[in-house]
Amino acid sequence: MKDKVFGEMQFNVGWCKMETISLWGNLYTFKIRISTTKDEVPSEKQQQAYLSFKKNLNEISEKSLGLVNDFLSNNIDEILGELGEPLPTNLTDLLIPNQVLLFKNGKTAIIFDAAWTDENVVIL
């Protein structure tokens, strides 16, 4: 499917495409995923949320880094219990961003792989 805002997308539990995005001064390959069924196309709210995400990426990068550091600080005992010491010098290596999820209502979430568990972490 080709969308006027997202471009070429494939269906895999929502319409998806891969995109390289700079976050926290690093380049990451993100899956951009639209919360839809196969019969639906991205909504105007999802298109606007994506455009806003791209436009405000520097602010999102700064804000999400603070949230990630807070999350890691609040969960340090669990992380140490799973990984032991020493922890990586760069604590953001413990949470690797891998997906931007755009909900039908226009909300956006960044999903991370967590180094100490098989579960994902979400920051809205």
Where are these regions (language model features)?
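A short catalytic or substrate-binding loop motif that flags glycine-/basic-rich loops and adjacent residues
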Residues: 103, 115-117
